[in-house]
């Protein structure tokens, strides 16, 4: 009998915290399947989900405000372990008969909590032991309200001078609350705390591994698709590449990929995609060379948003044209990943509860009467990368920096021309090549060159040069919501600048972008 890697599962209820997806990723890293749902999930849906344990996440609300979020009653009726984090601890306390009050002293940032209770959750987990034998943890706090009276048979788990009940527990029920955030890396023992809850207290086995996920996904694809044929738009990005490798492993020649070469890709990228999938892996790939069509449609347009729309529409037109030549296609594959699913799934409070498909190929599924196959829809980006490696894709492809859908079209400021794209491609290639040589590529989260449609005077030999300006951009980030400009060594910048100006006829000046996000965005357009 096939292994059910979803059998041991954790339910995470989202109360609006910026860290909620991080909790899910941490639980998955432990090797346990979990799902993230809105706090107002139906009682019946919770019972049907049948979790081994439940995590109540944090949120920005105050429990004593009218209509503030509450955990569904099913959470406490199921008799499974529950971990409340921050707001989750407060609503647990309030709903079970305790008391929560506003605090004059809010806690945001690093804190040290004393572990004062002997619980299963924190037994043997500490960062410090003081002279009196009191255990301490270095944690990350982010709260205003605090629990001032615990419900029922709860005991104090942890405390700080300003928050005497910074944690509470009832080992008999398997209920725990912590006012700090174990899911963020600033809480040093956070991984051990979550592992203790998920594995030891909830009894979940680590079945959620890359090899098991691949086997499970292959089995699901085969069951869904049968002997039918599947179409995939292959971009060369991480998600579509992993989908292609996975589907090829599952159904072989039943898969046909269409790779649209829009003339706005990185240097040699089209050839690399074809070599990887068609020549090395034996995948059926149709290459549509549509550079002229894209550039013709972009001619004269300088507005960034309009450029994006033109590129998107043209992609759909080209993809449609290629797809219409194929016969007997029943399924369209897409690289939808779990964050897409979370974003498009709402709560019942006026938001759509139905998960919408991200139709990155427009209305094609409806027009061609195709059914969707989305083998990555349960996976976070880091998990997609891991199964990419498991499927044999090269590390450099799987861990490549993000590249925008419109490609170089949004890295050429203003109107897009073939001349600009050709210059930019070469400059970008030099920058990335030198980052790799200096071992800086994987220290940066994203790095690229931007073409600026302005000219600057330069000197080459004894002659005057009047040529284009490009900007180097490199950032470090964890989540791409905020980013710091990368502090690259001056020697590296000097090498890159020298090579670009000397090797590319048409560039006279190289600048380095030292803007962080916010206030700037990572991409220029």
Swiss-Prot record:
Residue numbers binding ATP: 235-241
Reaction equation(s) it catalyzes: XMP + L-glutamine + ATP + H2O = GMP + L-glutamate + AMP + diphosphate + 2 H(+)
InterPro entries assigned: Class_I_gatase-like, GATASE, GMP_synth_C, GMP_synth_GATase, GMP_synthase, GMPS_ATP_PPase_dom, NAD/GMP_synthase, Rossmann-like_a/b/a_fold
CDD domains, alphabetized: GATase1_GMP_Synthase, GMP_synthase_C
Alphabetic keyword roster: ATP-binding, Glutamine amidotransferase, GMP biosynthesis, Ligase, Nucleotide-binding, Purine biosynthesis
Domain GMPS ATP-PPase: 208-400
Classification via SUPFAM superfamilies: Adenine nucleotide alpha hydrolases-like (SSF52402), Class I glutamine amidotransferase-like (SSF52317), GMP synthetase C-terminal dimerisation domain (SSF54810)
Catalytic residues in the record: 86, 181, 183
Alphabetical list of Pfam families matching this protein: GATase, GMP_synt_C, NAD_synthase
GO annotations of cellular component type: cytosol
Pathway(s) of this molecule: Purine metabolism; GMP biosynthesis; GMP from XMP (L-Gln route): step 1/1
Complex and partners: Homodimer.
Function recorded in the entry: Catalyzes the synthesis of GMP from XMP.
Name this protein carries in UniProt: GMP synthase [glutamine-hydrolyzing]
Source species: Pseudomonas entomophila (strain L48)
């Amino acid at each position: 009998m096939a292994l059910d890697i979803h059998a041991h599962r954790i339910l995470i209820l989202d109360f609006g915290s910026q860290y909620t997806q991080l909790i899910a990723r941490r639980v998955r890293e432990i090797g346990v399947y979990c799902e993230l749902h809105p706090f107002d999930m139906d009682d019946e849906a919770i019972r049907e989900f049948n979790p081994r344990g439940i995590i109540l996440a944090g949120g920005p609300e105050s429990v004593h405000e009218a209509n503030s979020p509450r955990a569904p009653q099913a959470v406490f009726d199921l008799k499974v372990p529950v971990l409340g984090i921050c707001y989750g601890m407060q609503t647990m306390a309030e709903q079970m008969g305790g008391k929560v009050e506003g605090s004059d002293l809010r806690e945001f940032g690093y804190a040290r909590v004393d572990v004062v209770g002997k619980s299963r959750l924190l037994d043997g987990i500490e960062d410090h032991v003081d002279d009196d034998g009191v255990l301490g943890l270095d944690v990350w706090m982010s709260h205003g309200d605090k629990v001032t009276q615990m419900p029922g048979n709860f005991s104090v788990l942890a405390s700080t001078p300003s928050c005497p009940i910074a944690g509470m527990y009832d080992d008999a029920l398997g209920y725990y609350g912590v006012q700090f955030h174990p899911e963020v890396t600033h809480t040093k023992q956070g991984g051990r705390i979550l592992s203790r809850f998920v594995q030891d207290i909830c009894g979940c086995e680590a079945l959620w591994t890359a090899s098991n996920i691949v086997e499970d996904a292959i089995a699901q694809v085969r069951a869904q698709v049968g002997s039918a044929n599947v179409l995939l738009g292959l971009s060369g990005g991480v998600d579509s590449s992993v989908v292609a490798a996975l589907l090829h492993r599952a159904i072989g020649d039943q898969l046909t990929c269409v790779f649209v070469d829009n003339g706005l890709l990185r240097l040699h990228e089209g050839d690399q995609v074809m070599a990887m999938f068609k020549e090395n892996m034996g995948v059926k790939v149709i290459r549509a060379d549509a550079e002229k069509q894209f550039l013709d449609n972009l001619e004269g347009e300088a507005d960034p948003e309009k450029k994006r729309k033109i590129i998107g529409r043209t992609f759909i037109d080209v993809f449609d044209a290629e797809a219409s030549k194929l016969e007997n296609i029943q399924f369209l594959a897409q690289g939808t990943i779990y964050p897409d699913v979370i974003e498009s799934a709402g709560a019942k409070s006026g938001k759509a509860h139905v998960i919408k498909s991200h139709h990155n190929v427009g209305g094609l599924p409806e027009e061609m009467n195709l059914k969707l196959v989305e083998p990555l829809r349960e996976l976070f980006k880091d998990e997609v990368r891991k199964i990419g490696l498991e499927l044999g894709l090269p590390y450099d492809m799987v861990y490549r920096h993000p590249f925008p859908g419109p490609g170089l079209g949004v890295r050429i400021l203003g109107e897009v021309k073939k001349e600009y794209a050709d210059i930019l491609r070469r400059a970008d290639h030099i920058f990335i090549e030198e980052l790799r040589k200096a071992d800086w590529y994987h220290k940066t989260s994203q790095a690229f060159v931007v073409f600026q449609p302005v000219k600057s005077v330069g000197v080459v030999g004894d002659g005057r040069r009047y040529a284009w300006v490009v900007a180097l951009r490199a950032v470090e980030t964890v989540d791409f919501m905020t980013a710091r400009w990368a502090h690259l060594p001056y020697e590296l910048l000097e090498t890159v600048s020298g090579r670009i100006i000397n090797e590319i006829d048409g560039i006279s000046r190289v600048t380095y972008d030292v803007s962080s996000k916010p206030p700037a965005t990572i991409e220029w357009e």
